[in-house]
Amino acid sequence: MVQIVVRDNNVEQALRALKKKMQREGLFREMKARQHFEKPSEKKARQRAEAVRRARKLARKRAQREGIV
């Protein structure tokens, strides 16, 4: 459970801290995923697509670091 301490009645700062913690813990992603049921086949396809995206991004970064691109 995420807890935030409000100091000096500064609610805006507490909200920013809450959003940052929720983002870091992946709660926004989980809430979005749980809004609708996802069939196992769709889940596998999405995960494969994400893996391909990550691999391409990593390859792009490696190529840029090595000076190929």
Curated annotation (Swiss-Prot):
Q: Which InterPro entries match?
A: Ribosomal_bS21, Ribosomal_bS21_CS, Ribosomal_bS21_sf
Q: Which of UniProt's keywords are assigned here?
A: Ribonucleoprotein, Ribosomal protein
GO terms, biological process: translation
Please indicate if the UniProt record lists Glycoprotein as a keyword: no
Pfam family membership, one: Ribosomal_S21
- Give yes or no: UniProt keyword Ribonucleoprotein: yes
Q: Name one GO cellular component term.
A: ribosome
| Any GO molecular function | structural constituent of ribosome
Q: State which residue ranges cross the membrane.
A: none
Listed PANTHER family = MITOCHONDRIAL 28S RIBOSOMAL PROTEIN S21, SMALL RIBOSOMAL SUBUNIT PROTEIN BS21M
Similarity field: Belongs to the bacterial ribosomal protein bS21 family.
Please identify the protein, giving its name as recorded. Answer: Small ribosomal subunit protein bS21
